[in-house]
């Protein structure tokens, strides 16, 4: 009875998207889940066949209209697995209600799922069900996580413009982090294992939200896990290194305490906090780096009323998204409890349906908890820009470290000389290095380091450091490439296109080179790392913005003729570089010690 009341009381805060266009949207995940097409090809194929998807053409159906039989069946199955499994005795009723009982995981179209998934996965636990350790849900969760983690992953964020797509994710294993979080929720809950969805409303170092799971032990302690992680291990929350700012745990129940504390009507709260079905768990993720953030009244753009809600906002492209809140205090200003650093924030208030800036951006130091503001001064500095996005998210550039350029007069390179070794990952599109060798070579090549898949986009060898035209010859190398369409062969390294690349089929042993026909001296090498097109691209139209007095100010538009941009901007300003021609990977940064530092 109490479980039914729990669900019914919270029905008004949940809903589904329904309608015929939803079927076409689901086809994206189904086709991608076959593993035979790249995501962009899947999207193009479905859009050609079905037309573009529009979320606003779907019907929003409140759960207050839920089929009573569906609800009853869900409750009966949830109680069945809770009571029959040996670990169920160590799952509290409250955790059962929040993390096993719910009939949905998001805004997906409702359909029966418990019995089907139970029948598929429950037999996998037969061998351990009789063990004493099976009374601890963490022990069983680890066994199940090992199984889920071993399956195929068809990851893409390209389809993230629609609702959750429901229990079919268990079969298709296709989508983004939110979809793989759903997958784990369905399987764990179908077997009576408590499992939650953990949320960053906005990544601390990215422009989008992020999702993962938490499993629980017999004492109710939670452990971070994700099918998308490198390993299947259940880890303590404070071992999660990603900059987070704030972390929330999705619940089925409405956080009525949060609403009461805010003291505002629903329409006067930002939509992210209008009907919050989540609770703040930042403290367990931040651990020893958990901070109380205080911004004094002197840092506000204007004076606020006492107890006015102030939102802690994180950057998303050129905008700012609320990820936390507190009530303004005329004496102290804004005091936010439980905040993790290494994130740039800005304060705002919610007025007339939008967030109004109330402070300059500032960085909260992760270790010390100290605050550093980005304030545009009168002094200008010259900045040299090489990319528009953090190179940490360009995984391929690091694969060039310890890569080596070699010369030889033996086709098999049994006797070879080292021309240059890459000691640091490249930070720009075109990298020029000098060669100190008096010998002449007929054969030259780039040999990739261990576990690099010989990732490289371009290599060019020059007889003289003054030459602008590279040497040419017959392309040689190790055949075989990763991918579905053979588009990443070694021949790409000499096609003159920095956006095609070599991705060798094996992690080690790959190389790409030239047979120059006759021996040549080599004085210069120019190379380009395999990349995701976030370096400065010749002739694209770029615009640099700097943050000043609550808004982004343009420093001008330019079309570069090289792989760098030069601007003059106020010293100490927060910056953002936009490519108006193509792409979407862009992020706030500062210019410090002669380099771009992204946040």
Regions found by a protein language model. Give the residues of each.
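Structured interaction patches on ligand/partner-binding surfaces of diverse proteins
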Residues: 351-379, 589-599
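Short acidic/polar inter-strand loop motif in beta-rich domains
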Residues: 350-360, 450-455, 581-587
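Short amphipathic beta-strand segments in non-cytosolic proteins
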Residues: 307-327, 406-416, 420-421, 532, ...
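Short Pro-Gly-centered beta-turn/loop motif in secreted/extracellular proteins
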Residues: 332-353, 438, 568-571
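Structural motif
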Residues: 281-282, 292-307, 392-395
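Disordered, acidic Ser/Thr/Pro-rich linker "stalks" and the adjacent N-terminal cap
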Residues: 377-440, 452-524, 528-537, 583-599
């Amino acid at each position: 009875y109490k479980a039914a009341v729990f669900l019914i009381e919270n029905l008004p805060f949940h809903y589904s998207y329904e309608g015929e266009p939803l079927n076409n949207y689901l086809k994206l995940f189904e086709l991608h889940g076959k593993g035979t097409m790249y995501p962009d090809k899947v999207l193009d194929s479905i859009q050609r066949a079905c037309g573009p998807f529009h979320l606003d053409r779907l019907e929003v159906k409140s759960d207050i209209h839920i089929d009573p039989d569906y609800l009853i069946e869900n409750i009966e199955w949830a109680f069945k697995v809770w009571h029959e499994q040996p670990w169920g005795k160590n799952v509290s009723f409250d955790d059962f209600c929040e993390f096993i009982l719910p009939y949905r995981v998001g805004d997906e179209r409702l359909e029966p799922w418990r019995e089907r998934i139970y029948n598929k996965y429950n037999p996998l636990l037969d061998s351990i069900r009789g063990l004493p350790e099976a009374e601890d849900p963490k022990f069983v969760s680890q066994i199940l996580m090992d199984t889920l983690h071993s399956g195929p992953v068809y990851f893409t964020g390209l389809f993230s413009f629609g609702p959750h797509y429901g229990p079919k994710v268990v079969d298709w294993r296709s989508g983004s982090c939110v979809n793989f979080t759903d997958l784990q929720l369905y399987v764990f809950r179908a077997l009576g294992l408590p499992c939650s969805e953990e949320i960053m409303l906005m990544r601390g170092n990215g422009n989008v939200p992020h999702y993962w799971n938490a499993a629980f032990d017999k004492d109710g302690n939670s452990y971070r896990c994700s099918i998308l992680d490198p390993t299947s291990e259940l880890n303590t929350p404070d071992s999660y290194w990603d900059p987070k700012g704030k972390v929330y745990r999705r619940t089925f129940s409405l956080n009525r305490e949060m609403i009461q504390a805010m003291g505002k009507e629903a329409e006067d709260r930002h939509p992210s906090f209008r009907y919050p079905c989540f609770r703040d768990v930042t403290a367990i993720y931040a651990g020893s780096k958990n901070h109380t953030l205080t911004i004094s009244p002197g840092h506000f753009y204007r004076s606020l009323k006492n107890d006015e809600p102030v939102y802690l906002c994180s950057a998303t492209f050129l905008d700012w998204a609320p990820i936390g809140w507190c009530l303004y205090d005329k004496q102290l200003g804004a005091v936010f409890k439980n905040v993790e650093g290494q994130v740039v924030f800005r304060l705002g208030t919610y007025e007339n349906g939008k967030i109004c800036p109330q402070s300059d951006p500032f960085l909260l130091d992760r270790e010390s908890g100290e605050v550093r503001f980005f304030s545009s001064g009168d002094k200008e500095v010259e900045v040299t820009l090489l990319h528009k996005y953090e190179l940490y998210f360009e995984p391929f550039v690091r694969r060039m470290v310890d890569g080596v350029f070699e010369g030889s007069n033996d086709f098999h390179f049994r006797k070879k000389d080292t021309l240059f070794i890459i000691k640091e990952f490249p930070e720009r599109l075109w990298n020029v290095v000098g060669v100190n060798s008096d010998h002449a070579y007929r054969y030259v090549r780039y040999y990739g380091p261990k576990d690099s898949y010989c990732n490289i986009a371009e290599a060019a060898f020059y007889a003289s450091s003054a030459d602008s035209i590279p040497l040419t010859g017959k392309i040689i190398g190790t055949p075989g490439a990763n991918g579905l369409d053979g588009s990443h062969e070694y021949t790409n390294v000499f096609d003159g296109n920095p956006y095609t690349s070599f991705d060798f089929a094996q992690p080690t042993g790959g190389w790409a080179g030239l047979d120059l026909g006759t021996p040549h001296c080599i004085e210069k090498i120019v190379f380009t790392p395999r990349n995701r097109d976030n370096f400065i691209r010749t002739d694209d139209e770029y615009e640099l913005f700097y943050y000043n007095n609550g808004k982004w100010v343009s420093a001008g538009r330019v079309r570069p003729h090289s792989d760098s941009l030069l601007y003059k901007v106020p010293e100490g300003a927060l910056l953002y570089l936009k490519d108006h021609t193509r792409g979407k990977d862009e992020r706030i940064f500062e210019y410090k010690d002669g380099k771009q530092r992204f946040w």
